[in-house]
Amino acid sequence: MERFDAIVVGAGAAGMFCAAQAGQLGCRVLLLDNGKKPGRKILMSGGGRCNFTNMYVEPAAYLSQNPHFCKSALARYTQWDFIELVGKYGIAWHEKTLGQLFCDDSAEQIVNLLLAECEKGGVQIRLRSEILSVERDEQGYRLQVNGETLVTKKLVIASGGLSMPGLGASPFGYKVAEQFGLKVLPTRAGLVPFTLHKPLLEQLQVLSGVSVPSTITAENGTLFRENLLFTHRGLSGPAVLQISSYWQPGEFVTVNLLPDCDLDDFLNEQRSAHPNQSLKNTLAMQLPKRLVECLQQLGQIPDVTLKQLNVRDQQTLVETLTAWRVQPNGTEGYRTAEVTLGGVDTNELSSRTMEARKAPGLYFIGEVMDVTGWLGGYNFQWAWSSAWACAQALVEVCSDNKVCTLLIKFVHKA
C-alpha cells in the first residue's frame, strides 16, 4: 500500500498542471492516466499547434449554470501567467485571430513543458493505470489501481468529459462525483459541427469545402461573427462550432452570409453603375461563385439583370442572404466535439479550491465540471486556472501536515 499527499486522475492539461504546481510547492503527488501517453488531447489541439490560451479571456466567455463560478480561478491565474510560463520555456507563439495564441512549432512543446514542470515537482506519473474502485475511509481515499492499493488524503479528478472518445474520454469523473453524492448535470457535445436534414443536405452537397465569413445567431440571441464552412455532413467552421454550445435540439439558427456588406445599398449602387449586369455576377463579387450558382439552381437567386430586379425580389434576396434560417438535424456528437457541456454541478464545489462540499478532500478541475469556454483557447485557460486554484488548496493541506510534524518533533526534542 502506497500513500501520497495527493493523487491526480487524468494526465491532460488540467491534471498535469495541477500535479506540477502542487509538487513544486511541497506535495508528494501521483498522477494517474489510463492512456499510453500523457497529453493526448493537447497534441491533437489547434491543428497540432495547441491554441493554449486566449488574450481576451473573461468570465463572459464561459457557459455554466452558475456563471459566477469561474470568476475566482480566472482572476487568480490569468492568461498572462500562462503566457509567462510559456516564455520561460522559450516556446515561440503567435496570435492567429481574435486573441487565439498558438505555438509556432508544435503542440508537443506544451506537453513537454507540462512534463518538465511535473519533473520539477517530483511528480510520479503512472500511465496505463486502470482505476477499479475509489473508496473513502478515515485515512482518506483508497484507490484500487492495477492490483495495487493507493491511499491519499486528497484526490483530484481531472479526467475530462466525453468528447473525442478515441483519445480516451470516459465518464469516470461523473461516476466518482455521483458515488460521493454530488449532482452531475446532463452532458452534451459542445463546439461541434451541425448535421442537416436530408433534403437540405442534398441541396448543399455541391458546396462542401466552401467557407464564407458570417454571423450566426442562436434563438437566445447569442451571436458569433466568424467563418462558416459547408461540409458533406452539414455545417462547420468556427461560427458553427461556437453557436453549437448555445443551440438546443429543434431550434433554428440565423445566418448572415454577408456580414461585411449592406446588400441593399450594394445592389442599388451596382444597378446605377451597371444596370445590364446579371444579378448572379454581381453577387459573385461578394460571395463565392459556387455558393451563388448553388443558390440560383435552388431558385433563391432570380436569373435577371440588375435593372430587371424588382423591389420585392430584392427584399426577398436580402432576407435570404442575410437572415438565412436553418434548423439543424443535430450535431456530429462527441466523436468530433471539442468539449463536453454540463458535468459536475459547480454548486457542489468551492470556487476557490475546487473541493467538493459534500466530500472533503475530493476535487474536480477542468472539463469534468460544468464550465465550458468558447472556441479559441478559453478551455485550455480554464484548465490552467482551475488546476492552479486546486493546487494552492492541496499545498495548504500539505503544508499544514508538515507544520504539525515539525511541531511534534520540536516538542519531543524540548
Describe the function of each predicted region.
Residues 49-94:
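Glycine-rich active-site loop/strand segments that organize a redox cofactor
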